[in-house]
Amino acid sequence: MFLFSAIGIKAQSLVAHKGKVKDGYNFWLYQPKEINTPKPVVIFLHGASLCGRDMNKVRRYGTIDAVEKGRQIEAFVLAPQNPGGAWKPEKLMNVLDWVKDNHKVDTTRIYVLGMSLGGYGTIDFATTYPDKVTAAMAFCGGGTKKYYSTLTQVPLWIVHGTADRAVSVKQSDIVVNAMKKCEGGAPRLHYDRIAGMSHSAPARIFYMKECYEWLFEHCLTDSARTVAPKFTISNQTLRTAYRDLSSRKQIGLIKH
């Protein structure tokens, strides 16, 4: 086992864990300030460029970086590191189970979001565990499963740009079209297919408070699992995604 605290936010609020979970991943875990009551878990899945063994890579962009830049989120943030290859849903669940066993977690509020390789991981994880994932957001990715009938149970928002040269927008199209062909269609799906958006642009969504507010609108206690209304994601809105963030302050507590 190896763990250390990050510099940049208070000690013990962000800790890296290595070799902690058998058949799992090394991971960062951010702990919110108030932990006397059960808190949601937000799982962030990174893209291929952050794969490896250097765990500080995972802090380069995404939800952990957003927290370090001042975005306060009233939830545990779980950010595993993939050493390489596709994300494995079973390994992710092993890590999540460790968090649930060792912290006060609200199991009705488990959220996952990721981009590129992490977008694939998000789709595959939600497809595998639709009864565990409360809501999900997948950016510029796709999916590796053959069937998506279980995915239609999950409130899901997919974002992909038509100018993506790393992962073709057709990969998201395949998932969306497969979901729509399932019995009952895809009533819990939002799909933003954005003209002219590049591969890297959706990374800015991780820094928007609206991203987490949208996730927190969902809870497994809602038997209908109604999908919350969208907020606006466009090339224009993403340009101002960092407008209220600073690495030197914490602002805008987002409550579940």
Each predicted region: which residue ranges?
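A domain-start/cap signature at the N-terminus of enzymes
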Residues: 7-41, 75, 120, 125-128, ...
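Gly/Ser-rich "nucleophile elbow"/oxyanion-hole loop immediately N-terminal to the catalytic nucleophile
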Residues: 34-37, 86-116
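Active-site machinery of serine-nucleophile hydrolases
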Residues: 39-41, 45-92
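Active-site-adjacent alpha-helix of alpha/beta-hydrolase-fold enzymes
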Residues: 63, 162-190
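Histidine-bearing beta->alpha loop at or near hydrolase active sites
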Residues: 77, 161, 191-201
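Short beta-strand immediately N-terminal to the catalytic nucleophile in serine-hydrolase-like folds
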Residues: 112-114, 139, 159
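A conserved short beta-strand
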Residues: 132-142
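Short beta-strand/loop motif that positions the catalytic acidic residue
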Residues: 152, 157-160, 164
